[in-house]
Amino acid sequence: MDVVGLFVLHFLRVLTVFVSFKGKGNMIQQDFRTKVGNTVFGVRATALILQNRKLLVTKDKDKYYTIGGAIQVNEKTEEAVVREVGEELGVKAQAGPLAFVVENRFEQDGVSYHNIEFHYLVDLLGDAPLTMQEDEKRQPCEWIDLDRLEDIQLVPAFLKTALPDWDGQLRHIHLEE
């Protein structure tokens, strides 16, 4: 097992699991997430959906995001990213190569976050929708040319340069806001 895998295993062993209810009948989703003081720790998987050198993103307010979300208990990261694409886009998908493992620390709305993120290249097995649905929230989807990523407020911002320059090798990235 490589260093990143060992780190993730150690992280998951000490991680407390919170149960989050997402309003889907009686189904309980257990996400890897815990809060210590004012810091929320979590493990996420995101989809880098590319076609013709364009990235599929969703827009919320003035920011753009890739599709993805929390990994659930006993779920492989590549299963999580496929599940998230299905839940949010309503399209079947297939996980491709893992491109980035990111340790992302940032603050949002007065809360500190420390996420371990797995960013996979993902192939859609159907047409991309015009909107994304997360719980009760609908957001528009857009294809953004990789050469234009620098012109938008993409979250996480490292993708603006790392994705167009990606050489096919797994990269481990540390981000701190």
Predicted regions, residues:
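Acidic/histidine-enriched, glycine/proline-rich intrinsically disordered or flexible terminal extensions
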Residues: 165-177
